[in-house]
């Protein structure tokens, strides 16, 4: 295998995915950036090229398992057989009262946010197993701490991501593969431009895409303490860390009351 590490990122054309692609490129990775937005991928590749680093980009609909497998295989071949990091970032977010959102829209959110992760994990596994010290990073959310009103379906998809992360970190540990999840709160990206809920009003939208990208890089190469404790979930930002800690040590009834009050603010 080549000495240069590689990272495959879904949803890489914009927002968190793009910031993460650039961050890993600046840290010497061969970057695989995949998305349905071919035009923005071209500009991402140009930007990485300007950094003097290498990018491989291509169209990818994460809900298509065959295309996902094809793109992962193509990238690993281009990266000389390595897949050091797999980042399942692609996702959408629908906000509003559950009954006001069309059922077809709910289904699409489930397809992208859950089936897209399954497709990525399944396609990446043989390459991760063949690459010593490989890591999977799944983009979950602080909404996987407790179900969020006006984000009910989205929150449910992120609980799925949380669960599959925990399970596969145990299953794949025998192959030396770490599986971790990021838990950001609201992030200033195009996905949240039109989102207005009780919790966005009470907590604000404070994180940037770069905040998440920086923490993803740290999660891939964690501190000795995080490595010793085998940290699986990484809340991003002060608010998410506070919420995660409070939920861990508070009784369920108190956590529910706190979330209800935030949603009604």
Language model features by range: what are they?
Residues 38-39, 59-70, 103:
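The beta1-alpha1 cofactor-binding region of Rossmann-like NAD(H)/NADP(H)-dependent oxidoreductases
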Residues 181, 201-241:
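C-terminal helical subdomain
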Residues 97-98, 102-108:
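Substrate-binding pocket helix/loop in short-chain dehydrogenase/reductase
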Residues 121, 157:
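Active-site helix of classical SDR
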Residues 29-43:
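Conserved glycine-rich Rossmann-like NAD(P)H-binding loop of the short-chain dehydrogenase/reductase
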Residues 13-14:
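Conserved glycine-rich cofactor-binding loop
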Residues 141:
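Residue(s) in the substrate-gating loop at a strand-loop-helix junction
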